[in-house]
């Protein structure tokens, strides 16, 4: 965790402006808002829910503002949480005492660990959820005054921001103005508006002003950020498939995908999930057909969404139109039919998002096996929206141009519930700490968390298409895993005072059992000959005795097998929870590789400890190329390590940066 010191502005006072209504207040002292709080969170999607809860856990008085309290926690697209890479983000959010993992365990209808056939470093916890239960339990969490005594929920729509210009090149946030003219004063504001900024929905050739079907977009915030403050904004697009009537689908000949016999909870607080293993709902697999592809190709001209190639959609979750254009030789694409809840008659067809006219959608759907008589309950659509170039953010997710303004979620160019929630919890923690005059900010390193990788990628390289998390993005994935997220991050959260006593107690108990068990295994040593005899295996002889911990490196070896084969092993397996046993088994397998990786981590950390001056004008370094000067001035990297990861920064430029860098103990240049 990097500790960032934030200094208060000492600039001369200039008038305060409520930019949407052009209200000008003569001085900062004369500003009298209708109501006052410490942190305002705009939007109650996945980023907003985590941001509001995290901010309140710091002790900051927090107000979550949303147009509809009944839509808090609404899942706009797929009815699932987690997956490869994404599931690790959920575990990290949970380790910081976030909500997503706990709510998923309550609302899940099917749990499955993806990538089981591969190494544990790339396992992906995933759950199908009941949409209505997810909303219900998320709303219950946020309304729990015992858990979040400092959190208030306000049903209203934010029209614009209230900014103060001290005249020193950047502004200061002072609150928001609502649609009804109410001014809410705040020390920090977090924008988590998802796909609602200047958004429009596309169905065929129709353009509809909406951020989600049936819900109006917001324009004032985009206008203020771009035209009044000077943020660089861009446009991205995404889409969602049609919702189908369950009774109109013939599942009899389709592939069945069941949940795991022993579901693995998303939250470290839980040993089990709410749904009984035998009562998990099935998913069903089908596929597109050549006939459907031909039909769709003949109708692509009817979609304005797919015709606009200047605005990028998600590469790794493309629409069916994009798949057919990108992979013309493929005769079929997989579709998973996912249930939307225990009592729901709605099916979500994962893998066939599109923006075709409604009549075309119905005809093409009926060319898919099992769906000859399918009925569409809600049409598929594409959505196009504004995002802010994330290179204008600090690692804390505070903006560089407006003090106290934080951005989280799809507004930063990401896609996915989990990526949004991960940003939300970091923005919420840091906004809350800042409002309480805390000098520390939570900035996770790439070597500490996938959240660190996510934010580091965004702020250094920006996005040209919606960003999605994968395990391949992390250089440290053998040590930064789903199973050990609590051991990595809960102590960091505890230092900041954001971890509940219940979670901290469980973490301490699990860590003690983990450490004691590994210590016992390291101290229990036998000769290679004795190990061979006990395990009925061929253990190569060596001069020194081998510890039980070393034996973990052998294929098919785990704690249960050791316990069964060695009566004298000084542990009681019955006293160790299954999730701790899993941690020990995985750590034992990866231990030799982690030792090697730690050498790389040390080299990585050396560059992370070389600090660069803040607000430095790199144009004064004559040996830098024009491109490098522009990149460095835009990103304003905090360290040599961060500068190294900016695309376009050359080795020669890095050599020059070492001249202006300093170690933490040295004064700022």
Swiss-Prot record:
GO cellular component terms, alphabetically, are: mitochondrion
Essential cofactor(s) = FAD
Q: What is the lineage of its organism?
A: Eukaryota, Fungi, Dikarya, Ascomycota, Saccharomycotina
Transit peptide: is it a keyword of this entry?
A: yes
- Pfam families with a match to the protein in the record: GIDA, GIDA_C_1st, SAM_GIDA_C
SUPFAM superfamilies from the entry?
A: FAD/NAD(P)-binding domain
The family line of this record is: Belongs to the MnmG family.
Q: How does it assemble?
A: Interacts with MSS1; forms the heterodimer MSS1-MTO1 complex.
One Gene Ontology BP term is: tRNA methylation
Q: Which PANTHER family does this chain map to?
A: GLUCOSE INHIBITED DIVISION PROTEIN A, PROTEIN MTO1 HOMOLOG, MITOCHONDRIAL
Which species is this record about? Saccharomyces cerevisiae (strain ATCC 204508 / S288c) (Baker's yeast)
Q: What is this protein called?
A: Mitochondrial translation optimization protein 1
Which UniProt keyword terms apply here?
FAD, Flavoprotein, Mitochondrion, Transit peptide, tRNA processing
Which SMART domains does the record associate with it? GIDA_assoc_3
Molecular function (Gene Ontology), one example: flavin adenine dinucleotide binding
User: Any idea what job this protein has?
Assistant: Component of the MSS1-MTO1 complex that catalyzes the 5-carboxymethylaminomethyluridine (cmnm(5)U) modification at the 34th wobble position (U34) of mitochondrial tRNAs.
Under InterPro entries, the record lists: FAD/NAD-bd_sf (IPR036188), GIDA_C_N (IPR049312), MnmG (IPR004416), MnmG-rel (IPR002218), MnmG-rel_CS (IPR020595), MnmG_C (IPR026904), MnmG_C_subdom (IPR047001), MnmG_C_subdom_sf (IPR044920)
Compartments, record wording = Mitochondrion
Extract the PROSITE patterns matched here: GIDA_1, GIDA_2
What main location does UniProt list?
Answer: mitochondrion
């Amino acid at each position: 965790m990097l500790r960032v010191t934030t200094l208060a502005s000492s600039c001369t006072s200039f008038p305060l402006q409520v930019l949407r209504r052009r209200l000008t207040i003569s001085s900062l002292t004369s500003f009298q808002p209708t109501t006052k709080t410490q942190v305002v969170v705009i939007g109650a999607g996945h980023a907003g829910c985590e941001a509001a809860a995290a901010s309140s856990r710091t002790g900051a008085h927090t107000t979550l503002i949303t147009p509809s309290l009944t839509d808090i926690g609404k899942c706009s697209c797929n009815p699932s949480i987690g997956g490869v890479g994404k599931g690790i983000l959920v575990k990290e959010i949970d380790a910081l005492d976030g909500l997503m993992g706990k709510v998923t365990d309550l609302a899940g209808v099917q749990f499955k660990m993806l990538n089981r056939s591969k190494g544990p470093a790339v396992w992906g916890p995933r759950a199908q959820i009941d949409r209505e239960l997810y909303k219900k339990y998320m709303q219950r969490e946020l309304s729990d005054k015992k858990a979040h005594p400092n959190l208030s929920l306000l049903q209203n729509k934010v029209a614009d921001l209230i900014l103060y210009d001290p005249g020193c090149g950047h502004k200061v946030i002072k609150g928001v103005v609502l649609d009804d003219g109410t001014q809410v004063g705040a020390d920090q504001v977090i924008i988590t508006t998802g796909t609602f900024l200047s958004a429009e929905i596309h169905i065929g050739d129709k353009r509809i002003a909406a951020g989600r079907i049936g819900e109006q977009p917001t324009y004032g915030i985009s206008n203020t950020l771009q035209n009044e403050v000077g943020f660089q904004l861009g446009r991205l697009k995404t889409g969602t498939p049609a919702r189908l009537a369950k009774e109109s689908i013939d599942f009899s000949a389709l592939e069945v995908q069941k949940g795991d016999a022993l579901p693995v909870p998303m939250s470290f607080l839980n040993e089990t999930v709410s749904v009984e293993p035998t009562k998990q709902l099935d998913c069903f697999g089908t596929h597109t057909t050549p006939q459907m592809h031909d039909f769709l190709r003949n109708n692509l001209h009817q979609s304005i969404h797919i015709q606009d190639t200047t605005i990028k959609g998600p590469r790794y979750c493309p629409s069916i139109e994009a798949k057919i254009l990108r992979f013309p030789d493929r005769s079929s694409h997989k579709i998973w039919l996912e249930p939307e809840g225990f009592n729901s008659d709605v099916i979500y067809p994962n893998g066939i998002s599109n923006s075709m006219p409604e009549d075309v959608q119905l005809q093409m759907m009926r060319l898919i096996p099992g769906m000859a008589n399918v009925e569409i309950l809600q049409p598929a659509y594409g959505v196009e929206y504004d995002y802010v170039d994330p290179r204008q953010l600090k690692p804390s997710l505070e903006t560089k141009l407006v003090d106290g303004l934080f951005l989280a979620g799809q507004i930063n160019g990401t896609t996915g519930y989990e990526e949004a929630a991960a940003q939300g919890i970091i923005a919420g923690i840091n906004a809350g700490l800042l409002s309480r005059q805390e000098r520390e900010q939570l900035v996770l390193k790439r070597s500490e968390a996938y959240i660190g990788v996510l934010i580091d990628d965004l702020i250094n390289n920006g996005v040209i298409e919606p960003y999605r998390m994968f395990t391949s993005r992390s250089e440290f994935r053998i040590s930064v895993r789903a199973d050990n997220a609590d051991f990595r991050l809960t102590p960091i959260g505890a230092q900041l005072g954001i971890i509940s006593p219940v979670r901290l107690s469980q973490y301490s108990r699990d860590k003690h059992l983990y450490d004691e068990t590994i210590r016992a295994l390291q101290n229990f040593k036998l000769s290679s000959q004795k190990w061979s005899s006990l395990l009925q295996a061929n253990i190569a002889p060596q001069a020194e005795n081998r510890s039980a911990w070393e034996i973990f490196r052998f294929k098919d070896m785990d704690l249960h097998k050791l316990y069964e084969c060695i009566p004298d092993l000084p542990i009681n397996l019955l006293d160790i929870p299954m999730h701790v046993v899993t941690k020990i088994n995985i750590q034992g397998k990866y231990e030799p590789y982690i030792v090697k990786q730690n050498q790389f981590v040390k080299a990585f950390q050396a560059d992370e400890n070389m600090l660069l001056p803040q607000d430095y004008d790199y144009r004064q370094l004559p040996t830098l190329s024009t491109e490098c000067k522009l990149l460095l001035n835009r990103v304003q990297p905090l360290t040599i390590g961060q500068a190294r990861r900016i695309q376009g920064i050359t080795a020669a430029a890095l050599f020059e940066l070492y001249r202006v860098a300093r170690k933490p103990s040295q004064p700022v240049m």
